[in-house]
Amino acid sequence: MSEDTIFGKIIRREIPADIVYEDDLCLAFRDVAPQAPVHILVIPKQPIANLLEATAEHQALLGHLLLTVKAIAAQEGLTEGYRTVINTGPAGGQTVYHLHIHLLGGRSLAWPPG
């Protein structure tokens, strides 16, 4: 259950986070182990483990998350571009089972990442 993850604890303010954005649907905070000068996680407040669990009823929420990433990127001054990543499941490298979008930027990012 994604309510019991570290992200659920951040949403409930049980543990601290460097929050950069919040609205009724989502929360965004700086990653504690950044992989780029700007590394922010955007998460829904609604508990969804990953994209495998997303349904058509989540369509508006998923769109909202992406537009929130765009707004935060602008707020952070990422005018030259940025990367968004959603890891899904063990084979996709997901370690926290609460859907989240990584926003990475502030430097040139190589491909493939690893």
UniProtKB/Swiss-Prot annotation:
Pfam families referenced in this protein's UniProt entry, alphabetically: HIT (PF01230)
A GO molecular-function annotation: catalytic activity
Ranges where the HIT domain occurs: 6-114
UniProt xrefs under CDD domains: PKCI_related (cd01276)
UniProt motif Histidine triad motif: location: 98-102
UniProt name for this protein: Uncharacterized HIT-like protein Synpcc7942_1390
